Regions:
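Conserved non-cysteine loop/helix-boundary elements of the Radical SAM core domain that shape
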Residues: 1-157
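Auxiliary Fe-S-binding modules of radical SAM enzymes
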Residues: 129, 139-198
Length: 198
């Protein structure tokens, strides 16, 4: 990830290269909670970023450990609260369903926890194993984990989004997706990621 100074230089270059006078949204994938710092958030605000995405993937620590994510559930909460406190009023959160070993109850727990944070939009990704992902490299280790109750999982996530006042605004599929499911974005009115629907 970029250091704050590098991020500042990059965003200066972006600002110098494009006309922002009619800009309606400036989104940055802030990414993993362990890579987000107060200094980086300050740089984003300085350059007029209006929407960020924080990507916990799951709120179950055992799953994060299993898939090789280096952040903790507590870091997710702290990072989200920090971004809110610093003034970000349009925060998306990304979750992945179909992660190894996750049951309906694990996904239900993640959805309950995200509702406590109350982001402005929510993206539910179905697991798609990338070529260099740990799940692909160590496929034998994860071969016994399967996704269950696909339709019920998507209904559970949709209900959580609805409880937060969100509606679906985009859907797409990708290669090697688990369980024949889709990726779905939910948002409150006026908080949809414009770049997702152009």
């Amino acid at each position: 990830t970029l250091e704050p100074e590098q991020l500042d230089r990059l965003l200066h270059a972006v600002r110098d290269s494009f006309d922002f006078s009619h800009n309606q949204e400036f989104t940055v994938e802030a990414g993993r909670p362990d890579s987000i710092t107060p200094e980086k958030l300050a740089v984003l605000l300085k350059h007029g970023v209006t929407r960020i995405s924080i990507n916990p993937q799951t709120m179950n620590q055992k799953t994060l450990d299993l898939i090789g994510r280096y952040h903790t559930v507590e870091q997710v909460k702290e990072t989200f609260q920090l971004a809110r406190k610093m003034g970000f009023d349009n925060i998306n959160m990304d979750f992945i369903v179909g992660l190894p070993g996750e049951t309906m109850e694990d996904i239900r727990f993640s959805m309950e926890e995200v509702q406590k944070l109350n982001p402005d939009s929510l993206t539910i990704h179905s697991l798609a194993i990338k070529r260099a992902a740990r799940l692909n490299i160590m496929r034998e280790q994860y071969k016994d984990f399967t996704i269950e109750n696909n339709e019920q999982i998507m209904e559970l996530c949709a209900a959580a989004a609805e409880n937060m006042g969100m509606t679906p605004y985009y859907m797409y599929r990708q290669k090697n997706i688990a369980g024949n499911m889709e990726n779905v974005g939910y948002a409150r009115t006026g908080r949809a990621g414009i770049y997702n629907i152009l």
